[in-house]
Amino acid sequence: TGGLLRETDLLERQQNFDRAAWRQQHAPNLAPGLLISLFCYEPSALPQLLSQLVGTPHHLLVTPGRPLAAVQHALASMPVHPHWSALPYTEQNGFDEMLWACDLNFVRGEDSLVRALWAGQPFIWHIYPQDDNAHHAKLEAFLDWMQTPPSLRQAHRVWNGMENPELPTLAANNLGTWATCAQAALDRLLAQKPLITQLLAFVQNNDIQVTPSQPR
């Protein structure tokens, strides 16, 4: 309800972003398929995703670190591989551009979730797992706020190890409803003032005195 952190130039950067040029640079041989980014932990459903991509024109962009290691481990036992490539490390703006350029984003943790929400593209969130499975309730609450269609809710549950069924297919009808959901969530966030603006207003309206911290 308090909004999310948003840079003052975020929307301008999005509007000026050359999506076609980015896609040509990072997936120059992409057929008329989906460009998918992968930033995850080690989901048990990863082999499912990779198998689903085999034989399709879709291309998977894998971020470095744990995602790349997980993909390489899964591919070691697969006789046929999907189209994929590894991305180098990048800074925040580069990560944002990847989210804007891709047709579907797999993101992990809270920071990348916020960036995925601002991107307005379909995404599947890998929430940080907790030993007592408290993250399950948090994920369900988020999916309720997102007003996710059944197929997208199932995708999140399977990706986060809450259900064992297969991942929903990346068919056009599924991606279409997921895109509508992501855009609706973005519209709701844009209708709010950014978090910093709301915090400043709260401080001013309640006459809260803020004392600058002293260096130690």
Model-derived features: where do they sit?
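Nucleotide-sugar donor-binding patch of glycosyltransferase catalytic domains
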Residues: P122-E163
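Short, hydrophobic beta-strand segments that form beta-sheet elements in well-ordered domains
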Residues: I36-F39, H59-P64, L104-V107
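Short, solvent-exposed loop/turn segments at secondary-structure junctions
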Residues: E42-S44, P67-L68, D131
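A donor-sugar binding/catalytic signature common to diverse glycosyltransferases
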Residues: E91-K138
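C-terminal amphipathic helix plus adjacent low-complexity
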Residues: T148-R216
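Catalytic donor nucleotide-activated moiety binding site of glycosyltransferases and closely related
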Residues: G55-P88
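A conserved mid-protein helix/loop that constitutes part of the nucleotide-sugar donor-binding site
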Residues: P43-S51
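A nucleotide-sugar donor-handling region in carbohydrate enzymes
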Residues: T1-P43
